[in-house]
From Swiss-Prot:
Its EC number is 2.4.1.227. UDP-N-acetyl-alpha-D-glucosamine binds at residues 19-21, 131, 170, 201, 255, 274-279, 300. It catalyses: di-trans,octa-cis-undecaprenyl diphospho-N-acetyl-alpha-D-muramoyl-L-alanyl-D-glutamyl-meso-2,6-diaminopimeloyl-D-alanyl-D-alanine + UDP-N-acetyl-alpha-D-glucosamine = di-trans,octa-cis-undecaprenyl diphospho-[N-acetyl-alpha-D-glucosaminyl-(1->4)]-N-acetyl-alpha-D-muramoyl-L-alanyl-D-glutamyl-meso-2,6-diaminopimeloyl-D-alanyl-D-alanine + UDP + H(+). It is found in: Cell inner membrane. One of its GO terms (molecular function) is UDP-N-acetyl-D-glucosamine:N-acetylmuramoyl-L-alanyl-D-glutamyl-meso-2,6-diaminopimelyl-D-alanyl-D-alanine-diphosphoundecaprenol 4-beta-N-acetylglucosaminlytransferase activity. GO terms for cellular component: plasma membrane. Its main location: membrane. It comes from Acinetobacter baylyi (strain ATCC 33305 / BD413 / ADP1). It comes from the Bacteria. This is UDP-N-acetylglucosamine--N-acetylmuramyl-(pentapeptide) pyrophosphoryl-undecaprenol N-acetylglucosamine transferase. Gene3D superfamilies: Glycogen Phosphorylase B. The lineage of its organism: Bacteria, Pseudomonadati, Pseudomonadota, Gammaproteobacteria, Moraxellales. It is a peripheral membrane protein.
Length: 365
């Protein structure tokens, strides 16, 4: 029998770059892998935000020079095959040098050459798709991956290697108490409805411009918490002037503690990025999603449908955000019992153990 103490720890190379939507889930999995005794390294791009996010995470970074080719100019497309080959060779060199046992791709330009390198070297591949519509790189890698993880059901065609895991989320979010208890407690205390508006780190201009008047026009007792981004802070604050006396408003550039914000909210109005939808479900909050209209393949609408189709959320397309439509949408939602029922449905469709599920799958490679 093999002595477990003599078994070499699995070396897993993470592949995620470009946006927080790719990097944060990969980082959650990477930290969990380390806790399980795995060696972890990270394949990154030279200018990607992953370098900053990984700075103090005790994960060695290996960079390959690669950029996206989708929708770019003719010259870049002509050069793309050569850049991909060069990046693939660099990735192969790192993987051989580090004796990588498995790779885990979470999206971004780096995952293409990294996945190709692993395929050539015979290293097993796991991919994870955060959105309800698969990105280009993951669509290609799904053909050769050993495990295909999806956050939302039926993102990929049915196969033995497809697993619906959900998106990894922060522990502070999974620790939030049940929605029924939270909503009932606020109702028993006679609190006005708490409306949370989240535009993301840069703020969402459409939400900042159109929601203040829509909420003022409801003329109901409300506590409004509006995160608008730094650049639009003053403009958004001014839009709430002359709010009804029964409406309390806090406008802020950023929210430091999103777990607390979710915990206190009766209704959240926000974009429908993959991690946002996942966090809303995990926290258990009723939602109105306003999908980003320029999102590739309209994937934010597909993300939002995951909760809208089960009665846990409403979808409001940005192009329809007229005063009349917003009034018709919001008025029926100003009912805590209804919002509580939506929040409970959201929590029922959460997958709070997604991080461990993905880690377990990587361990089987």
């Amino acid at each position: 029998m093999t002595d477990p103490s003599q078994v070499k720890p699995k070396h897993v190379m993470m592949m995620a770059a470009g946006t927080g939507g790719h990097v944060f889930p990969a980082l959650a999995v990477a930290k969990q892998l380390q806790q399980h005794g795995c060696q972890v390294s990270w394949l990154a791009t030279p200018a990607g935000m992953e370098n900053r996010l990984l700075k103090d995470q005790n994960i060695p970074i290996y960079q390959i020079d690669i950029q996206g080719v989708r929708g770019n100019g003719a010259v870049r497309k002509l050069l793309a095959p050569f850049k991909i080959l060069k990046a693939t060779y660099s990735a192969m060199r790192y993987m051989k040098q580090l004796k990588v046992d498995a790779v885990a791709g979470f999206g971004g330009y780096v995952a293409g050459p990294g996945g190709l390198a692993a395929r050539i070297l015979g290293i097993p591949i796991l991919i994870h798709e955060q959105n309800a519509v698969a990105g280009f790189t993951n669509t290609q890698l799904a053909r050769v991956a050993s495990k295909v993880c999806e956050a939302f059901p039926n993102t990929f065609p049915a196969s033995a290697k497809r697993v619906t895991t959900g998106n990894p989320v922060r522990k502070e979010i999974t620790a939030i108490l049940s929605p029924k208890w939270r909503y009932d407690s606020r109702e028993q205390a006679g609190q006005p409805l708490n409306i949370l508006i989240v535009g993301g780190s840069l703020g969402a201009q459409a939400l900042n411009e159109r929601l203040p008047d829509a909420l003022k026009n409801l003329n109901l007792p409300l506590n409004v918490f509006h995160q608008c981004g730094q650049k639009q802070f003053e403009e958004t604050r001014v839009r709430y002037t002359n709010a009804p006396a029964n409406m309390s408003v806090q406008v802020m550039p950023f929210i430091e503690d999103m777990a607390q914000a979710y915990r206190d909210a009766d209704l959240i109005i926000c974009r429908a990025g993959a991690l946002t939808v996942t966090e809303v479900a995990t926290a258990g909050v009723a939602a109105v999603f306003v999908p980003l209209p320029i999102a590739v393949d309209d994937h934010q609408t597909a993300n939002a449908r995951f909760l809208a189709d089960v009665g846990a959320a409403k979808i409001c397309q940005q192009s329809t955000m007229t005063p009349e439509n917003l009034d018709a949408l919001l008025k029926p939602l100003m009912n805590r019992q209804l919002l509580s029922e939506m929040a409970v449905k959201a929590r029922q469709h959460a997958q709070p153990n997604a991080t461990q599920h993905v880690v377990d799958l990587i361990q089987t490679l």
